[in-house]
Amino acid sequence: MGDSILELKDLSHSYDGSEISLNNISLTVNKAEKVSILGPSGSGKSTLLRLIAGLEKPYSGTITIQGKVVSDQDHLVAPEKRNVGLVVQNKALFPHLTVEKNIGFGIRKNREKTKIISDLLSLFKIEHLSDKYPHEISGGEQQRTAIARSMAPSPELLMLDEPFSALDRELKEELYTELNQIIKERQQTIMLVTHDLDEAKVLSDNQINLENI
């Protein structure tokens, strides 16, 4: 296995048992690698992330995370036991929770919760927003919060599904710089789904077209 974090072997998916949305995908992502998955709308990019996260069941094939098979023909490991994080385009923050409580939602039983939240608030430069609710902060601040929340449990693999597509160019570039610095500091393994080749080149070392794997 070497230092691989994720291995996909002959992974296929079908929503209705007839129309194939993903067909025999094989891919390896190594520790601290930053990979972008490119492809046109409807090519299955988001579905691929949902399969890895355990939110969809594959038609066939194997998903291995940190040397452990989490999905094959015989069993399916629950999403919360896969040690992966997923950030989606719509941010999916809990509207009734503050920024601080959103970030801490997935680590409520962690004894180091207070320190982890404090460190992430500082890292993403949102300490001053800790008591604010999602509707009280900007789109960029919401996205910072969403990424911080996904990193709170220290996932081995952080997956980003078109996370900046709703933001303007200036804000995107600001977040690119911040996120690259954070990823480097934490040696975080990243899988980014995007249709934007320029974004992929800025945020990843390896750009892969889904139609070619």
Regions found by a protein language model. Give the residues of each.
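Helix-to-loop junction immediately C-terminal to a conserved catalytic motif
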Residues: 53
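Conserved ABC transporter NBD signature motif
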Residues: 61-72
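ABC ATPase NBD coupling module
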Residues: 70-85, 109
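Conserved ABC ATPase "signature" region
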Residues: 71, 111-130, 180-181
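Conserved ABC ATPase signature
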Residues: 133-137, 141-143
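A short, proline-enriched helix->beta-strand linker immediately N-terminal to the Walker B motif
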Residues: 152-156
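Conserved H-loop
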Residues: 187-193
